[in-house]
Amino acid sequence: MKEYQTITEISGPLVYAEVDEAIGYDEIVEIETAQGETLRGQVLESSEGVVAIQVFEGTSGIDQNASVRFLGETMKMPVTEDLLGRVLDGSGRPIDDGPEIVPEERQDIVGAAINPYSREYPEEFIETGVSAIDGMNTLVRGQKLPIFSSSGQPHSQLAMQIARQASVPEEEEGGDDEEGSEFAVIFGAMGITAEEANEFMQDFERTGALERSVVFMNLADDPAVERTVTPRMVLTTAEYLAFEKDYHVLVILTDMTNYCEALREIGAAREEVPGRRGYPGYMYTDLAQLYERAGRIQGRDGSVTQIPILTMPGDDDTHPIPDLTGYITEGQIYVDPDLNSQGLQPPINVLPSLSRLMDDGIGEGLTREDHADVKDQMFAAYAEGEDLRDLVNIVGREALSELDNKYLDFADDFESEFVDQGFDQNRSIEETLEIGWDLLSMLPKDALNRIDEEFIEKYYREDDSDRQVVEAAD
C-alpha cells in the first residue's frame, strides 16, 4: 500500500492525484484530510500518471495536503445470512445500532450478468398481494419488472406494500423440496428524503417485514456518489442469499432516477461528452449491468427478482431513463396520475402495463387454470369501457346500447373494486381471480369470447333473477 500527497485538482465529487505506479480501475482509496478524517473513494479513471477518484462521502475538507492511499483491491460487500433484519447505509455499513456484522465472506460488488447458457427460464409465480399486478401483470421469479411513476405519486407506498406482502406460494406436491422456498426482500433506497426513510422503517418494523429483509438507505443529503454504489451492494447481497443460501430474493430499488442523476453528475465532473439530455452515453450499459443481475441459474434453487422503481421526469416515458430501462427489462407497471387523482390505491393503470413473462408463470399448477383467460377478458372489457368513456363525452350515455352501458359499468367497477384495494390489503391470487369473475359476470356470457366454455360454466356468476328461476325450476 503506497501513500501519496499529490492531489492536483478537486472537481465536484472527484479528486485527481498524480501517481508513479499502475493503479487499477475500481480500486478502493482512503483519503486522510489535514483534520485527521478518513474518507473512502474509488478509482474511476487511471491514465498517464493521473488517477480520478470518486469520493463517497464528498470532497468537503479535502485539500492538496491530504494523503491518498491505494488499498490494492476493489470494493467488496461483507455478506452473511445474518444481514437479514439489518438496516445499512448506502455503502453497506450498519446504521441500526445492532451488533457488528461478522461476514462469512466478502464479495466484489461489481458482480457480473448471469451467463445466458446457465440461465434458467423464469416460470414460477411471485404473489405480491396486489390484484393489478398478480391478476393482470404477474411477476415471476427471476424477472425484472420496473414500476414507472412520476413525482408526487404514491410509488413509495406501493413499494412498501410489495415489500411487506410479497411471498412465494407453496410448492405443488411432487415439486422442488422446500429448502429452496425461503423468501427474502432486499430493499435499496437511493436519494430518498428523511421523511420517506422514516415511513419505510416504521412500516417495516410495524408489520414485522424487517425480519426477512435487508434494508439499504441512501438519503437525499448523502453524497450522490454513494448512490452509484448502493444498488451494487444490494444486488451483491441478493446474489449471495439466492445462489449460495437458496433464497428466493425480491430486490426493490427506488429511485433509479436518483441513481441516473448521480451518473450525470459524475459525468459532468469528469467533463465527459454528454449523451441524451446530458446523461452519460454509457448509461444504457450501466443500467444493463444492474438489471441483468436478476434471474435464475440452472442447478441452483434460489432466484433474484428485481422491481426497480423510477420516477419519469415530466411524466414522460420517452425520457432516457424509462426509455432505456424499458429496453432492458421485461415489462413495466404504470402508476397513473389520473387514477391517483381519483383516489385509487394503488393507482396502477393496467392498460399500458405489461409483464412479458406472465404467460409462463400462470395457469394450472402455478396460479389457477382460468387465470390467462380471465386476464385476457378483463383487459379487453376494460379497454372497451375506456373507449366508450370517450364516446359518452360526445353522444351521451343514452345513445349507447345496453351492452355498451354494461362495459361502462364494468370499467367503473374494475377500477373501484379490482384496482382500488388500498395499500394495506393483501389479496391472495384466489381472491383476485374471484373478484375478476364477479366483474366479468356483469357481462352476458356470449360477450366472454376470450374465455373457454369450461371455465364459464365453472366460474360465471348468474345474477339473482336467474338464480331464482333456476331454483324455482328445481
Swiss-Prot record:
- Gene Ontology MF annotations: ATP binding; proton-transporting ATP synthase activity, rotational mechanism
The membrane topology noted for this protein in its Swiss-Prot or TrEMBL record is: Peripheral membrane protein
> What SUPFAM superfamilies does this protein map onto?
C-terminal domain of alpha and beta subunits of F1 ATP synthase (SSF47917), P-loop containing nucleoside triphosphate hydrolases (SSF52540)
The GO biological-process annotations, alphabetized, read as:
proton motive force-driven plasma membrane ATP synthesis
UniProt keywords (A-Z) are:
ATP synthesis, Cell membrane, Hydrogen ion transport, Ion transport, Membrane, Transport
Q: Is Cell membrane a UniProt keyword of this protein?
A: yes
Q: Name one GO cellular component term.
A: plasma membrane
Under PROSITE patterns, the record lists: ATPASE_ALPHA_BETA
InterPro entries from the xrefs?
A: ATP-synt_VA_C, ATPase_a/bsu_AS, ATPase_F1/V1/A1_a/bsu_N, ATPase_F1/V1/A1_a/bsu_nucl-bd, P-loop_NTPase, V-ATPase_su_B/beta
Major place of residence: membrane
The cellular location(s) given in this protein's UniProt record come to: Cell membrane
Q: Which Pfam families match?
A: ATP-synt_ab, ATP-synt_ab_N, ATP-synt_VA_C
Q: How does it assemble?
A: Has multiple subunits with at least A(3), B(3), C, D, E, F, H, I and proteolipid K(x).
**Similarity annotation:** Belongs to the ATPase alpha/beta chains family.
Q: Which PANTHER family match?
A: V-TYPE PROTON ATPASE SUBUNIT B
Briefly state the protein's biological role.
Answer: Component of the A-type ATP synthase that produces ATP from ADP in the presence of a proton gradient across the membrane. The B chain is a regulatory subunit.
User: What name has this protein been given in UniProt?
Assistant: A-type ATP synthase subunit B
Which species is listed as the source?
Answer: Halorubrum lacusprofundi (strain ATCC 49239 / DSM 5036 / JCM 8891 / ACAM 34)
Q: Which gene encodes it?
A: atpB
